[in-house]
UniProtKB/Swiss-Prot annotation:
Source species: Methanococcus aeolicus (strain ATCC BAA-1280 / DSM 17508 / OCM 812 / Nankai-3)
Protein name: Alanine--tRNA ligase
GO CC field: cytoplasm
Subcellular localization, as worded in the UniProt entry: Cytoplasm
Function field: Catalyzes the attachment of alanine to tRNA(Ala) in a two-step reaction: alanine is first activated by ATP to form Ala-AMP and then transferred to the acceptor end of tRNA(Ala). Also edits incorrectly charged Ser-tRNA(Ala) and Gly-tRNA(Ala) via its editing domain.
Coiled-coil positions: none
SUPFAM superfamilies noted in UniProt: Class II aaRS and biotin synthetases, Putative anticodon-binding domain of alanyl-tRNA synthetase (AlaRS), ThrRS/AlaRS common domain, Translation proteins
Amino acid sequence: MEIKHDYNVQLFKEKGFIRKQCKECNQYFWTLDPKRETCGDSPCDEYSFIGSSITNKEYTYNEMVKEFLNFFDKNGHTPIKRYPVSARRWRDDILLTIASIAVFQPWVTKGIVKPVANPLVIAQPCIRLNDIDNVGRTGRHMTCFTMGGHHAFNTDEDFKYWTDRTVELCYNFFTNLGIDGSSITFIESWWEGGGNAGPCYEVITHGVELATLVFMQYEKTEQGDYIEMPLKIVDTGYGLERFVWASKGTPTVYEAVFGDIIGKLMDDANINMNDIGPKILAESATLAGLMDIENVGDLRILRQKVAEKLNLDVNELDSILSPIENIYAIADHTRCLAFMLGDGIVPSNVKDGYLARLLVRKTLRYIKNVGLSLSLKDIVAMQLENLKEIYPELMDMKEYIMDVLEEEENKYIQTITKGKGAVERIAKSKDEITLDDLIELYDSKGLPPEVVRDIVEEINKKGSKNNKGNKTIKITVPDNFYTIVAERHEEKKEDSKSEKGENTAEKSTISINLDDIPETELLFYSNPYQKEVEAKILKIIGNVVILDKTVFYPEGGGQKYDIGLIGNKKIISVQKNNNGIVCHTVENTDGLNEEDTIIAKLNWENRLNLMRNHTATHIINAAASKVLGKHIWQTGSNVESNKARLDITHYKRITREEIKEIEKIANQIVLDAIPVKSTVMGRNEAEQKYGFKIYQGGVVPGNILRILDIEGVDVEACGGTHCQNTSEVGYIKILKTERIQDGVERLEYTSGINSVNEVSLMEDILLNASSIVGVPCENLPKTVNRFFEEWKEQKKIIEELHKKIGELEKGNLNDKFEKVGKYDLLVEKVEGAPKELMSIADNLVNEKDNSIVILLNNSGYILCKCGEKVEIKMGELLRKIAKGGGKDKMAQGKCADDIETLKSKVVGEL
């Protein structure tokens, strides 16, 4: 189905814009210049602003952000604060904030929630890593950029503005900056994404696209049809860094945005721009505007084009540009990291943490390439300093950012050290390191492809014996490797271990057809202390009972379901379906009938424990944030009656001292007897009042949220049952922590009487140990340490005795070898533990490289070992003569035969 759209807006008519078709790309565009024959965008036009500003003054990044917001503020738009670059803070379908419209998805764009203002304007830092391999090379690509967006959300009842006003505002913003109106072209285009579609304009000047104006007005069906949306959205995107670039006319966007930082990096790397020559750099950057690695795929071909234009050898051009491009990438990546880490992302092996680590390691590689003495921490600190005027909240996270960068750098060094063996193992069995190998090495071992290439080159030079003589291992690293990796991880939908089945925003549901049944009245919200209710049975399906009202909390939000009785029937599960109907599964329904009125009674002790543990979860989360830092974010939880657990993001193991401090703060909150209040409020109101921390437990759907507020401690959107005061939680005891995945720590804990029971159990263990050792409890550590040291000494003595026994046995057994075929064979019964038999066999085969040694002890343990020249595989031999297995040179197992029978079997196999 083709949609026709009239792109001739009021501004074009008033100003005299002409519609033309580009002679290069055939796209239609609008221009004031009657002589123009091309659309103005690259590659149809080269950059024509490099070397001279096209605005009335040069702007810094901070100035351009203010200029953009102020312009639209004066033109009837309400400025709103930026959202985090981690989109997971308020939505679960994407990892990073990729556009200004993303902050309003899905709730506002679907019409579920009204926007915080209408129309509005935002300067939103965005991150897109699908162009990461272009960064530094093209002069225009950035991993992190600021999308200026003015948005209007139009309904029939409240229509703000549409195409005419949008284009007018855009044109006026450009010309107010001093950009010549005759240089501006509006290219007709069509936008589709996320199931929506609409016409759009790409706004170009001097060869560079500075803005896109999208008019989101259609939903696209699975059949490819377009349906008018009830909510029509003006979705604009202005590349504010590109405006800064156009205002300065520098060869690349990087000098324009990061000028002072790039200067320091160039000085530190001893790169003298005067040696390169302004002409080479400017020409190179202009032609680089035509480069797009995604389309061409091979930097070498692109380099060749630039070299030909400049009359340079391509290798010479490489040597000139590569260090500079590395510097550009470092500047870009470090600002991106300032936002990612400043917004609380924790580097890890999954999701947005994986992307942060990718950026860290890529930057460290560039720093090494150009030989900087400045560290990654130093450069990110510079970025924070530059950003603090507009984004002071990032500077508040500086301590965490510096600490996590140091931790990541240390991990990277360890990874490189350990990685050589992994590469050698692949090289041993293959003639080529493939792209899949490179991705696997990067994902599982953290090895950048450049490091793998260095290791392979070293292997090839040495003609390593690990790689079958002197064969050459082939390896090709694609120019867009990091783009491929980033896209794979941005698209992954699988849940991590901490979230799978435990995401606290998820609700367990049950699938039963209950179309004729009304929503269940949930009494536990109005009064969580109500222990029973007289309710009517609306429906019985198998062992599932539906009541008109219930005191039983259905499983969800990480909290286990309540148990109790319906009549005299035990409840074994409580779930809620998507229509708000609570399904109680009982042991059997004998004696229960539809329309009966029954008493539904809670197991109150179980409910009270659940309430205590759930409130304790909020308390511990808040305490952990105080002790470990503001980056702490809940990734999952599981609340049961006897204990609970909480999964939080953190970049290193939690120490014993930190656990004690978290526990101390948590119990102080309990002692402070703080009221726990539950209120219902709109999504916008909750977000503006409390921020995105309300989604610690996961993304909650809908316009109305249930907010749980422990005043001054923790505020979250939560649907669970809770105590009404922290004093009711009782003693909180953290039992243990574990690292369930890189970047995620799990805390397990109890509350109330369960904590008392746990401490009592620990005390019993301590007293029992004290009794066994025969010393008071306070002397246990010292005594146990002494015993341990003595044990280690005894172990050494025993090992020495094993060696001596082995040597003695070797002397006794050396004369008992028999020649069987071409091998020296020894099959003997020897007293000793497996370790002793291993020592004896080692001594024997080390002296006879053509020998097979088979030893059997009284317990039926059998060991087979052979010398280097033996071609028979011991694992296969053992499986034929006994039970067990092993490898080529050693195998072990169990044998019930006497020694003579065993010897006969062995000889038969040889």
